[in-house]
């Protein structure tokens, strides 16, 4: 119902992307920049920590580009960022190595191209009762947040999680009416 086009399962992807055969203690680290501008000190700092950790443990350092915010995407930002990293001696073992260029067995390394993978896991969580669609608008969520802040209550649960216990029929009607939704985790605690 929520992901009708998704026919793969988490098991499929776990077979497609098996655990890496690395020595014990090796770390796989990543740098996941948004292509929204140039490399800045915060990027460089987190990237250097990930890179040094991977290299010190004979692990793998990869770059995965978080390109889901298309509104803020800056043309050429990926190339500029990779060039900036190379100035500091940071070169990925795998992942994005150029504008629209990738290497490695765990591709795709552009976040937007991994959508089906994430949706397969999301669908599995829903089927297990561990996630649910929330149809609350941004305005409704702002009102809920303001009410909770006034009462000094934290978190999105109980009476505030208005969509948590919708029936399958209610969910179906909302989806069929074109209502937008986001997926929320359903904690049993």
Regions found by a protein language model. Give the residues of each.
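N-terminal Rossmann-like or analogous alpha/beta NTP/dinucleotide-binding catalytic cores
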Residues: 1-149
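Active-site cores that bind ATP or allylic diphosphates and position pyrophosphate for catalysis
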Residues: 124, 131-189
